[in-house]
Structure formats: structure tokens, C-alpha cells
């Protein structure tokens, strides 16, 4: 989703995929081939890469920076294997729902920076409030309770095994 990307050649990537496939020892290990060609070379070259990567043995294709439903659909129509969609905020792709992606034929969706952005925004807001007010009383409502934290990390269970 960044500008000014440089691509390795299709042939070089195909070779990398073939090497990865040959080295694969666990049938549950997936070779996921990413292509950033759309933002550099356009959709037609992306389709060429998708087909070449599948032919090289990739288990899944990760077409990066599809702009809209139409581009996601074009890739699906030209791909034979599983597809991964990247829904990162502030990127080049229109943010689609899980249901939309399923309807478009995508198998996996990732939200690679969503939780980090949520957490850091809350941290920033909280620290600004503490700096301004001189205390954290006004941000406690935004915090996870101790009880919930302990539930999430199964704190009580960990004490049993000590």
C-alpha cells in the first residue's frame, strides 16, 4: 500500500516459489505468494504473476493493493487457488467487509496493523490526558480492568501450575 515500490522480476519470484515448494516438508505449511504488481504494473501484469505463481506451486496468492471490488473480482476470476485479502487502513484498497470478501471468493483476510493502530491511538489519547490533567482519573474508563486482563491471560490457571 506504499508508493514507489520496486518489484523483482516475475521469473525471479517464480524461482523463489519453486525453491520454497521444494523445501516444504509439512503438508500444513502454506506457500503464500504476494504480488505488489498492481500498484506498479497494473492489473493485467498482476494476473500474469498470479497465474505464474500458481503454476510454480504457491498454495495461496496475496494480491496486494487491489483498489476496489472490481479488481478483487478480476483476480478471483483468474486465480485457481486460495486468495488472501489485505484490509489495512489508510492504504490503496477500499476496506471491504468479511462478507463482501467471501462473496468475492477470498479465503483469508488479514488486518495487519488494525490492533496496533487502535492500541496506540488509545495510548496517545491517554498520555495526552494525563499530561494535561496531571492524573489518570479521566482515562480509567478507557482501560481494560484487572479482572478482564487476568481472564485473558488465564492468570488464575498459571498460579495453579507454579
Q: What do the PLM-derived regions correspond to, one by one?
A:
Residues 160-162:
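Conserved small/polar residues in nucleotide/adenosyl-binding loops
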Residues 5-6, 138, 147:
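Flexible, active-site-adjacent loop/turn segments at secondary-structure boundaries
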Amino acid at each position: 500500500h506504499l508508493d514507489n515500490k520496486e518489484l523483482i522480476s516475475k521469473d525471479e519470484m517464480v524461482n523463489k516459489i519453486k525453491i520454497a515448494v521444494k523445501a516444504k516438508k509439512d503438508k500444513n505449511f502454506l506457500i503464500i505468494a504476494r504480488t505488489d504488481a498492481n500498484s506498479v504494473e497494473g492489473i493485467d501484469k498482476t494476473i500474469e504473476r498470479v497465474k505464474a505463481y500458481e503454476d510454480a506451486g504457491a498454495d495461496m496468492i496475496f494480491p496486494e493493493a487491489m483498489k476496489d471490488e472490481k479488481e478483487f473480482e478480476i483476480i478471483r476470476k483468474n486465480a485457481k487457488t486460495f486468495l488472501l485479502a489485505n484490509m489495512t487502513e489508510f492504504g490503496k484498497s477500499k476496506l471491504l467487509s468479511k462478507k463482501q470478501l467471501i462473496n468475492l471468493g477470498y479465503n483469508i483476510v488479514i488486518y495487519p496493523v488494525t490492533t496496533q493502530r487502535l492500541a496506540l491511538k488509545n495510548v496517545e489519547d491517554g498520555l495526552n490526558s494525563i499530561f494535561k490533567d496531571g492524573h489518570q482519573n479521566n482515562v480509567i474508563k478507557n482501560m481494560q480492568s484487572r479482572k478482564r486482563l487476568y481472564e485473558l491471560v488465564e492468570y488464575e490457571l498459571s498460579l495453579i501450575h507454579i
